[in-house]
Amino acid sequence: MLNIMEVHETNKMIEQEKLDVRTITMGISLLDCAADSVDEVCENIYNKITTYAKDLVSTGRAIERDFGIPIVNKRITVTPISLVGASSCKSSEDFVKIAHALDRAAKKVGVDLIGGYSALVSKSMTPAEEMLIRSLPQALSETDIVCSSVNVGSTKTGIDMNSVELLGHIVKDIAHATADNDSYGCVKFVAFCNAPDDNPFMAGGFHGVTEGDAVINVGVSGPGVVSRALDEAKGKDFEFLCETIKRTAFKITRVGQLVAQEASRRLGIPFGIIDLSLAPTPAVGDSVGEVLEKIGLEQVGAPGTTAALAMLNDQVKKGGIMASSYVGGLSGAFIPVSEDKNMIDAANNGCLKIEKLEAMTCVCSVGLDMIAIPGDTTAATISGIIADEAAIGMVNQKTTAVRVIPVEGKGVGEMANFGGLMGYAPIIPVNQTSCEAFVTRGGRIPAPIHSFKN
């Protein structure tokens, strides 16, 4: 039974501590939309999305109103489009037509973002997957809310270096195609290793082929709540600190579980998972960086940052997993530089560098996220960054990702502004020493020895 103190506590978390449900995401399978012609595929996709998701936004708003819980985004994920369009798409331009169909359908139902313009190439690329990847600069520059991801590796299969090398050039081309908007197209693209099938967050969300016809996944967010709770832990030992984070994560996740079950009931679509992630925003007091600083760092990036983040990530999972019947997605603490006020400040004064961020990705929820880098960064350097991050994920059996923005026409110290939840970021330096001879070797990096578990 709920008591009145718990009700007041939850209300305080929402009103004063910026607790929100970051997203209700509906996953929709498009496997049955495949057809002989691209136009027919586009029509099938449009019809299925607008049928299944027609009430998603209104239901989200009704739940907000009925329970008083802010739901920031309503989103859709779909089956990786490289699979759906494989039989009908004969060129990159054909895939771009599907991107436009996704954009139109998502706008019709009123969602904020749609993810799944994706390819899974952890071992090698099919012709269709390569065409989709080559279509990304045009697709992401011509659409508004379509998000894309490419899974380039996994612990079981290794890393496909052919796709990694290609993606360095593609990221540069996306940046060029959207140069008039601080290369915003790169915000909508992420390269993954060990990508999950049920991620409700963007830009990496897609509806995996292991999923059913439709599902509701929910991502929660509460770094501000954790930050306020840590005020009570000042000067206390690690046991008290960990217990405080765990208890707070439990409360945050219960809110997400309530919203997920209610959305599932009202929409008549099965509940999938809760993603336990702490997802920051650029607003003051809604920062993962602030949480790390309250744990005891002068500023994010100081020695000890990786250890503090490892502890935070683990306690969030331990607390949250007891609050939901199904946990999945990425689940942990996000470190997106442009979306986190304290990380923006740390990057601005040189305390937080890309090398430290890479170390932090060994223990955080995902990887190098929302990092603005100089526009003259080479394609090979970007491929090298993706390869490094994929290797961390492959060897450590975790999800890792890269979402870097080489801001065309800007250099170190200048500011890139992406707007809204995406925030803003100082452009930070990247080691420009060449790795071209490495990333252009061709072939794939084999899976690690500990992947052989049969």
Swiss-Prot record:
> Entry's Pfam families?
DUF711
Quaternary data: Homodimer.
Q: Which PANTHER family match?
A: UPF0210 PROTEIN MJ1665 (PTHR37560:SF1), UPF0210 PROTEIN SPR0218 (PTHR37560)
NCBIfam families (UniProt xref): PRK05313.1
Q: Of which family is this protein a member?
A: Belongs to the UPF0210 family.
Q: What's the name of the protein?
A: UPF0210 protein BAD_1323
**What is the scientific name of the source organism?**
Bifidobacterium adolescentis (strain ATCC 15703 / DSM 20083 / NCTC 11814 / E194a)
Question: What's the source species' lineage?
Answer: Bacteria, Bacillati, Actinomycetota, Actinomycetes, Bifidobacteriales
